[in-house]
Amino acid sequence: FQFKPDGSVLAIGRRGGGKAQLLKSKPPYKRWERRDLDRYIGGPLLMKWGDRYIAGGRKSGAALVGKRGPKTALYWLNAEAKTEQDHLTEFAELPSNGDTSYPGFVELSPTRAFVSWYSSHEKDADGKSITAIYMADLEIQK
């Protein structure tokens, strides 16, 4: 959830294996506006970075045609877009595969942030998949 200065709230909701939804509400939060996004987002993240919103989570299915397994990705969110296709713009696919999701995000400045996620894309010395937590330092070049 992200609360705006006017008290309204913005959220991303996962809907099983279907398309995620953008959720909006105003106090007292009894009525919610729901809009389908154009893709599935597992373990969704929604954060404010500078003057923009970012969303993140696991992508799978049609989003990965020609690729192997689920990936964790980050998107710019345009909460005011009028069509499904205009809400999300992917800007990063994190090193990931298999069991992967739940990105975390810490804004350090309007142009720099840390992101964390877990993934099972690496193998141990015996060739068995391991699940590990990863962190990346992101910087926006202006």
Language model feature labels by segment:
Residues 102-104:
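Signature of short aromatic-glycine-proline-rich micro-motifs recurring in repeat-based ectodomains
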Residues 1-98, 108-114, 118-142:
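Beta-rich carbohydrate-recognition and catalytic domains
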